[in-house]
Amino acid sequence: MAKAPKTAYVCNDCGAEFSRWQGQCSACKAWNTITEVRLISTAKSKNDRFSGYAGETQAKIQTLSEISLQETPRFSSGFSELDRVLGGGIVPGSAILIGGHPGAGKSTLLLQVMCGLAKNMTALYVTGEESLQQVAMRASRLGLPSDQLKMLSETSVEQICNLADQLKPQIIVVDSIQVMHLADIQSSPGSVAQVRECASFLTRYAKTRQVAIIMVGHVTKDGTLAGPKVLEHAIDCSLLLEGEADSRYRTLRSHKNRFGAVNELGVFGMTEQGLREVKNPSAIFLSRGDEITSGSSVMVLWEGTRPLLVEIQALVDHSMLANPRRVAVGLEQNRLALLLAVLHRHGGLQMADQDVFVNVVGGVKVSETSADLALLLALISSFRNRPLPQDLVIFGEVGLAGEIRPVPSGQERISEAAKHGFKRAIVPFGNKPKSAVENMQVFTVKKLTDALAVLDNL
């Protein structure tokens, strides 16, 4: 009599396994995300080519000094913004995951990249969601050279790797990982087990063949990559392509990168010919015209290895509600509440009866604390209905005691602002330039009261 297959219960969000079903995942605290999956015994690989890892067919112990320090040469994707996010180009043997909402432009960007790379190397584009005719129509509409790019419509990972062994490409795109499946996994495509095992299989194939594999992934409603968390641990680089549906600009950000900086940012513009690089991102995020308005300030972000000028807009208005509204777009809601408390305690401005709305222009998401001072001065400008000078740039972290703390790369931020024509800057005292910046008047402040005093004299 055949034994009944073993089962386990796996969380669809984080991949945690349990011996029985429960309503809430004790690992990630999500509700109703645990599903039953069948377990199969992992047999020894019948193909020795798939048994090695990182290019080695058999594992062996080495001393650290015996390992070659020669860096694997990268190759360019054809897009300098994408190369920047990847850390300087595509590394052979790397496994890259790129996610984004439907319509963000993931497939369009990768099709443009692959058509360009196919001129000088063997490139394979595997589509599992679209037919070959649909991909060909998109390439024709975008005016892309399509005579060299190899195409394959397949969802079986084993078959994809077998065909790739015959073609021997230098780069493979798999669109998308959620529709791929392995025959040995007893679950439907898109399940936790299938996504995890397919990604691991493709990653192992990339390492053993020294072929770069780019996998397309779906995202959840909150903007995180769908599938188990172990998916992000298995790959080398995780990218997220973001952009509002009604916006012509897209931002590509690295959330994990073993070959470069994390949180590196690349900016693209969506056109009729596909995605185009934006060489000067600061220009598109500064939307101010000739008319000076209150509640607007400019700060310098540090995204990965590049400085970026961003405009912050604030609107403070008397509230008709018992509980005034606090809305932050592009900024953390809790950070806004914290700064309002600091402004009341150490700045003497009471906004408890005011509605407060804050927005970062261009859809940029700001997570670093260097935006604190710029946000506070924008709030004060709106509250007093007094515009800030157009040639003023601001950055600095604000502490709970009202102190202004320095931020990393202060000199580079000031220099970037000067390049864009800004004449004045309010910065923390700890970021005081070691030498004078040409055509830039720098005001250094230690406390919030110092910043308010500078603001009154501008």
UniProtKB/Swiss-Prot annotation:
Leader sequence residues: none
Q: Where is this motif: RadA KNRFG motif?
A: 256-260
E.C. code: 3.6.4.-
Transmembrane region positions?
Answer: none
The enzyme's main class, written as a single word, is hydrolase
Zinc fingers typed C4-type, residue spans: 11-28
For domains, the record's comment is: Has a putative N-terminal zinc-finger, a middle region with homology to RecA with ATPase motifs including the RadA KNRFG motif, while the C-terminus is homologous to Lon protease.
Query: NCBIfam families given for it?
Result: sms
* HAMAP family associated with the record: RadA_bact
The family line of this record is:
Belongs to the RecA family. RadA subfamily.
Descriptive protein name: DNA repair protein RadA
The taxonomic lineage of its organism, from the top, reads: Bacteria, Pseudomonadati, Pseudomonadota, Gammaproteobacteria, Pasteurellales
Q: Which gene encodes it?
A: radA
